[in-house]
């Protein structure tokens, strides 16, 4: 079977460049990559179709084709131009998706794939355009839906007009409605996602989650080749560096691994840690944020939104605690992240995820697979994966560390 993944935003390359360093390079890309590799390993012909970028700031994505070593016989990364050469964020892509669909059809000609699998609203909208012209069926995986993000931002004091200008919610939600209506199958991670997110009033008429035959609930999994409790050579190579920072006291730590995004609520775990510091005498708070090693220096290279998030964290922590009780780690790959998890798991540490809403819950599963005890948000996917016995993050953290 020939299967094509449609993922206009972000990009893909063998080095996983910029993963978690930009809002368009989040866990969705890991999901697409690993699912595509699994299908290729099982004998299917698979293409990941994304956007071609000719931009000196993003040099990894200028080639028409790329591969992942080990699956090159069955898996290709294909990049098609649309909207000019420069990198465009997902909010800037909407006017160019028709051109993207045209380029895809021009490439395949009469040799159309058997099936498209579309990711995020821009991929879904592209798939709907292609289905209209070729009748090729497609599945839709939303990853996160715009209506929930909009609700959270309005609850936080945002104004519709300002939010729509910035995040293009009108176009995103319209694209999600089209994707939902015309998809042959919709993949969700949890029952909550199906029964609550897709029943949001803004999807009324497009989505009927009572028609469960159209929905497939597929909980997130984890790549056990990377995230496991067995040490490898990388563990031994990073241990001296970590020992220099964290010493040989084997003190416990609270691990956070996230990009700098307000909805990830890193500030929530920082405040919870500071609130209970007297009870967490020798415990360290470790913020694993790709690209951030010296936060007061590295902040200059961040976007304005990321700078706002990091400044709030730094102001809350204060200068005295950074490097003493609170540490930033620049973890540059999934392999290094897994080794870092194992290092701290050996000290009886925990992983904390305090997002306002987390549709997937992939990160805490990866952390748990590497041996860390997870403390996670009750909002979204993690609530169906982990039990919830605590009233607050700070209480959960203390009891998890004790046990």
Stretches with model-predicted labels:
Residues 1-401:
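Catalytic cores of nucleotide-sugar-dependent glycosyltransferases that transfer UDP/GDP/TDP-activated
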């Amino acid at each position: 079977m020939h299967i094509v993944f449609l993922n206009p935003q972000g990009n893909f390359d063998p080095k996983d460049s910029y993963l978690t360093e930009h809002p368009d390079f989040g866990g969705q890309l890991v999901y697409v990559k690993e699912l595509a590799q699994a299908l290729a390993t099982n004998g299917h012909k698979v293409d990941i179709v994304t956007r071609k970028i000719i931009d000196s700031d993003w040099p990894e994505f200028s080639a028409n084709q790329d591969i992942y070593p080990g699956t090159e016989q069955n898996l290709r990364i294909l990049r098609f131009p649309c909207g000019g050469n420069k990198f465009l964020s997902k909010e800037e892509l909407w006017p160019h998706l028709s051109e993207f669909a045209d380029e895809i059809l021009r490439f395949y000609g009469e040799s159309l794939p058997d099936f498209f699998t579309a990711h995020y609203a821009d991929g879904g909208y592209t798939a709907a355009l292609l289905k209209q012209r070729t009748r090729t069926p497609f599945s839709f995986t939303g990853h996160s839906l715009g209506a929930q993000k909009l609700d959270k931002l309005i609850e936080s004091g945002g104004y519709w007009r300002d939010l729509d200008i910035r995040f293009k919610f009108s176009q995103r939600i319209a694209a999600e409605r089209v994707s939902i209506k015309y998809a042959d199958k919709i993949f969700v991670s949890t029952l909550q996602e199906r029964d609550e997110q897709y029943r949001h009033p803004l999807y009324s008429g497009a989505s009927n989650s009572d028609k469960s035959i159209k929905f497939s609930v597929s909980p997130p999994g984890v790549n056990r080749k990377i995230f496991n409790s067995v040490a490898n050579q990388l563990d031994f190579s990073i241990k001296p560096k970590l020992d220099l920072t964290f010493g040989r006291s084997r003190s416990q730590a609270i691990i956070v691994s996230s990009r700098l995004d307000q909805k990830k609520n890193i500030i929530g775990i920082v405040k919870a840690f500071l609130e209970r510091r007297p009870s967490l005498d020798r415990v360290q708070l470790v913020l694993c944020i790709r690209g951030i090693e010296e936060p007061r220096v590295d902040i200059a290279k961040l976007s304005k939104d990321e700078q706002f998030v990091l400044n709030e964290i730094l102001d809350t922590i204060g200068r005295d605690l950074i490097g003493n009780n609170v540490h930033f780690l620049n973890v540059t790959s999934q392999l290094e992240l897994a080794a870092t998890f194992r290092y701290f798991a050996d000290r009886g540490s925990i992983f904390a995820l305090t997002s306002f809403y987390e549709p997937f819950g992939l990160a805490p599963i990866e952390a748990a697979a590497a041996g860390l005890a997870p403390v996670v948000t009750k909002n979204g996917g993690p609530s169906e994966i982990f039990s919830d016995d605590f009233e607050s993050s700070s209480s959960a953290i203390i009891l998890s560390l004790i046990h």
